[in-house]
Amino acid sequence: MTTAAQIPGLEAAPTKHARLVAWVREIAELTQPERVEWCDGSEAEFDRLTSLLIEKGTLVRLNDEKRPNSFYAASDPSDVARVEDRTYICSEKAEDAGPTNNWMDPAEMRVKLQGLFEGSMRGRTMYVVPFCMGPLGSHISALGVEITDSPYVVISMRTMTRMGAPALEQLGEDGFFVPAVHSLGAPLESGAADVPWPCNTTKYITHFPETREIWSYGSGYGGNALLGKKCYALRIASVMARDEGWLAEHMLILKLTSPAGKVHYIAAAFPSACGKTNLAMLIPTLPGWKAETVGDDIAWMRFGEDGRLYAVNPEAGFFGVAPGTGEQTNPNAIKTLWGNTVFTNVARTDDGDVWWEGLTKQAPGHLTDWKGRDWTPESTEPAAHPNARFTVPAGQCPTIASEWQDPKGVPISAILFGGRRATAVPLVTEAPDWRRGVFFGSIVASETTAAQAGAIGKLRRDPFAMLPFCGYNMADYFAHWLEVGQKADQAKLPRIYYVNWFRKSPEGKFLWPGFGENSRVLAWIVGRLEGHADGVETPLGVLPTRDALPTDGLQIDEADLDALLTVDIDVWKQEAELIPEHYQTFGDRLPAALWAEHEALVSRLDG
């Protein structure tokens, strides 16, 4: 076995952080790489690594005239998405992981990982990637170091985080960091040929909440391999937030300026495929309103000295789903992707650009699909994988807010929760207090089957849009939200709203046009925050009056508008009957306050 002293580059650590240096040495001895590189995040390093990846066949440089400094990657067809069934929360006690997470005894998992990681980087370079989640120097930010044997991960981390020398400098000689180890699980024996996308059929994405560690094996794909994203910024950070009294959330952050010049910041949590990025990059249809982007996916929120809740976007880039993103749905995203972008599992055009379903109304006559095959509009499979991605610097977004890197964060005025609901849930409902808002967050769901008229389809619950990302028992997470609200100055807490852009008629037609028209709902919310928009009390909460929701210039049927702005008592009685089954999943750890909210809803519906 090679000792640490024999591994080139290991002793060249550009830091005096003793714990970091010792940990890197320990992982090098375990994984046995050919050499170690300490990443500085420089442009020269990026250029060197992209050239290496082109040489290996992992990346293809796109046409510089069409897409400057941009690249295309195609993954192994077995490695295309997050692997929820291989994602573990290894808390000391199983009950602390809770019923919504996979748990394994940490001692057992460590033995398993030890066996998998032993020699797993043989024949490869081990990269040490220091990074900062959130603006450098912010009291809301936190540091991490990822060790990886994937240069694709290194270049992606440079886009998605503040990576390299500045993060290492911030760490100093004894600063706290989350250690994150990633291996493709594809050691290269001497003289063996590599493949363009190395990975392993065995995959483990593991989190140790008490020790704040992340270990990921076998996947080179996004959320499994870019460990600053879901693994740190949500699963580990949610545990840190619980212990330290803050919030780490799966939320966009939007800056809204009214025609009167008043600014409000709004955070919103929606499950995937419910329009989070589209709302984050909203182009308002209402005259005089301006929307700007602070973040599209994750928010870290702490109370400031003035008692208000301040949020930062811990990421530095967007890791977005390409299919469905087009001029019609999200023109700002399309403008963001002009260059400096890595596209993964999209299709390639004959002139060296990229394409995916939804980019244009008509597909090109010929493409190379994500599996490298010829594709024409007559082909039976999509040209791009449905989870094809783009990785792009957030600063390129034309609507990026000037405050997006403000170390103080931005003060949140309102928090939105919502799922994809064809039935029951009105367009927008205001919670009368924080507790009702937490109740709304706890019951968020999307309908996975079509509903019959007057009935509810099959629901997939995704409380707070955190189901795949909460790093501890979700019942304790609800309790944490309730506690955060109890301790705060009630007058300064953000107001909470339950929204639904996806109501359908019995015939299956969307009742609300969505996209830029959602600015009308935001205008009513701002009106409520400022005390000049009317609402009507319902058993669910406060809904807009017909006159209070700005509908000028909107082509919408009166009956559809009525359905959007009504709480159907009979349907909501059915909805309320479905909640206990969801709550019982959490057993006696579910906060009594949420059962009380449910009982109060039932009694208001009966009233």
From Swiss-Prot:
Record CDD domains: PEPCK_GTP
Q: What reaction(s) does this enzyme catalyze?
A: oxaloacetate + GTP = phosphoenolpyruvate + GDP + CO2
Binding residue positions for GTP: 273-278, 389, 420, 515-518
Q: Where does Mn(2+) bind?
A: 230, 250, 297
State the top-level EC class: lyase
The Gene Ontology terms for molecular function here are:
GTP binding; manganese ion binding; phosphoenolpyruvate carboxykinase (GTP) activity
Q: Where does the record place the catalytic residues?
A: 274
Q: Give the EC number.
A: 4.1.1.32
Spell out the subcellular localization from the entry: Cytoplasm
Tell me a GO biological process for this protein.
response to starvation
Q: For this UniProt entry, what is the primary localization, expressed as one broad class?
A: cytoplasm
Keyword terms: Cytoplasm, Decarboxylase, Gluconeogenesis, GTP-binding, Lyase, Manganese, Metal-binding, Nucleotide-binding
Assembly, in brief, is: Monomer.
Which family does the UniProt entry place this protein in?
A: Belongs to the phosphoenolpyruvate carboxykinase [GTP] family.
Identify the HAMAP family for this entry.
PEPCK_GTP (MF_00452)
What task does this protein carry out? Catalyzes the conversion of oxaloacetate (OAA) to phosphoenolpyruvate (PEP), the rate-limiting step in the metabolic pathway that produces glucose from lactate and other precursors derived from the citric acid cycle.
Q: What is this protein called?
A: Phosphoenolpyruvate carboxykinase [GTP]
Source organism of this protein record: Frankia alni (strain DSM 45986 / CECT 9034 / ACN14a)
Upper taxonomic lineage: Bacteria, Bacillati, Actinomycetota, Actinomycetes, Frankiales
